[in-house]
Regions:
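Signature of multi-pass transmembrane helix bundles
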Residues: 4-7, 13-17, 22-32, 49-52, ...
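Transmembrane alpha-helical segments and their short flanking loops
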Residues: 111, 312-407
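Helix-loop-helix junctions within the multi-pass membrane cores of secondary transporters/permeases
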Residues: 259-342, 396-397, 403-407
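Hydrophobic transmembrane alpha-helical segments of multi-pass transport and channel proteins
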Residues: 51, 89-93, 97, 227-232, ...
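Transmembrane helix boundary and interhelical junction motifs in multipass membrane proteins
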Residues: 56-60, 199, 269-277, 291, ...
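Membrane-water interface of transmembrane alpha-helices in multipass transporters/channels
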Residues: 36-40, 78, 213-221, 249-258, ...
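Short amphipathic alpha-helical coupling elements at transmembrane boundaries
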Residues: 39-50, 79, 135, 143, ...
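Membrane-interface alpha-helices at helix entry/exit sites of multi-pass transporters
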Residues: 76-83, 187-194, 284-299, 328-330, ...
Length: 407
């Protein structure tokens, strides 16, 4: 049994792909003919989605608080941390804007018309900027969690994080409790993720049965456009930053960081690529150890540029496909939330799932989009992690030029 568990854990990505393919085939050829298949997969899919949604709000809250606390505790690193944070947050904002504007300009998802059940969670819909501002502060934090008001949960987490930093040692005990809760939430989510192949199968069957082959075509098109956006962002934004701010040839930069980028693509983990990323920038680009030792690990935690592109892209794609209108004010909320959520997104495979669920809830998308997102998450995650790691190393090159290190 133990050997099977180890084998399954190592090959879970392949199992997810198998579940996706079987789900598509079942939805196309069996679900419409045998009603029991459609009923069974719908029920099991709902159970899987409920298990995931169960921990989304506490995980987002705890992750944001701990992310802010970890940044605050890094004050001893001085100007390097501050400069790195500024670089990462600016590029994340640009990435989120790119992810929102491209699908809107090309109307990605229009005409697909996904048929899905509406979400059980009441989304936070803001009709104007004034309504958004008035709804920022929760009068009752417990109600914000209970009613599924993700925007208020994010703001409450932000306030709590900075408050715990401000009170110093008195807040350490509560931080330890929140850290333990964060680890517990991650453990529960990771346990649920072991059932992802079955969950993907059960959630994709009703979608394919209702929408037919256009589901496959639309998702394939979306993936191609997404990867074009990834490549464009990496070469234009990071290449431009390295050239203009870092005074380094983009060709030299991309050639030097290729081993770390390919490793990130294969492992889907920014954290696991830290040693190789440090080696690339130090040995091939002359980045001082003092800069890389701070910037690379910090980037693995807070630099989620490609994830911001991915999540914004997916939100707009599913909104168009499901007929959900995303107003300008909601786009602004998503952009700001993307920047905030990047602080708490763990640099591990599938770390963006909770963040996507939070944004999907805010945008008022049907609960069923989560199943479709998870089914293609690994394909998206490979490219996203690769771009994130490139961004970490680009930050190192920029900081090498902008910050003087005493020898």
């Amino acid at each position: 049994m133990k050997s099977f568990y180890e084998w399954y854990r190592k090959h879970i990505t392949g199992a997810i792909f198998v579940g996706l393919i079987l789900g598509i085939l079942t939805g196309l050829f069996l679900a419409g003919r045998f009603n029991v298949v459609l009923t069974a997969t719908s029920v099991l899919g709902s159970i899987y989605m409920s298990a995931l949604n169960m921990m989304i709000f506490p995980l987002v809250f705890c992750s944001i608080v701990m992310g802010i606390a970890s940044i605050g505790s890094a004050k001893t690193t001085g100007k390097i941390t501050g400069a790195a944070m500024l670089f990462f947050l600016c590029t994340t904002a640009i990435a989120s804007f790119v992810g929102l504007i491209i699908p809107r300009l090309i109307c990605l998802g229009k005409g697909v018309s996904f048929k899905m059940a509406t979400s059980d969670i009441q989304a936070t819909k803001m009709d104007s900027i004034l309504d958004t501002i008035k709804g920022l502060i929760p009068s009752n934090p417990v109600s914000a969690f209970a009613e599924g008001n993700m925007l208020q949960v994010l703001v409450f987490a932000l306030i709590m994080g900075f408050t715990l930093i401000a009170i110093g040692e008195k807040g350490e005990r509560l931080l330890k409790v929140i850290d333990s809760c964060n680890e517990a939430c991650l453990k529960i989510i990771s346990t649920v993720m072991y059932f992802t192949p079955i969950g993907v199968f059960c959630t994709i069957v009703p979608v394919v049965e209702a929408n037919g082959t256009k589901t496959i075509v639309s998702l394939a098109t979306q993936l191609i456009i997404l990867y074009v956006a990834f490549c464009g962002f990496a070469f234009i934004v990071y290449g431009g930053a390295v050239s203009i701010l870092g005074k380094t040839s983009p060709v030299k930069f991309f050639k030097a960081i290729m081993p770390a980028a390919l490793n990130a693509f294969g492992t889907c983990s920014s954290s696991a690529t830290i040693p190789l990323s440090k080696s690339c920038v130090e040995d091939k680009l002359g980045v001082p150890n003092q800069i890389s030792s701070i910037t690379i690990p910090l980037g693995a935690t807070v630099n989620m540029d490609a994830v911001s592109i991915l999540m914004s892209f997916m939100i707009m794609f599913f909104a168009n496909a499901c007929g959900v209108h995303v107003s300008i004010s909601m786009m602004i909320i998503i952009l700001l939330a993307n920047v905030l959520l990047s602080v708490g997104t763990p640099g591990i495979p599938g770390g963006a799932i909770a963040s996507f669920a939070a944004l999907a809830t805010m945008a008022g998308l049907p609960a069923g989009v989560m199943g479709v997102y998870i089914s293609i998450n690994t394909l998206c995650d490979m490219g996203a992690t690769c771009v994130n790691v490139i961004g970490d190393m680009a930050g190192c090159v920029v900081l090498k030029e902008k910050i003087e290190i005493e020898k």
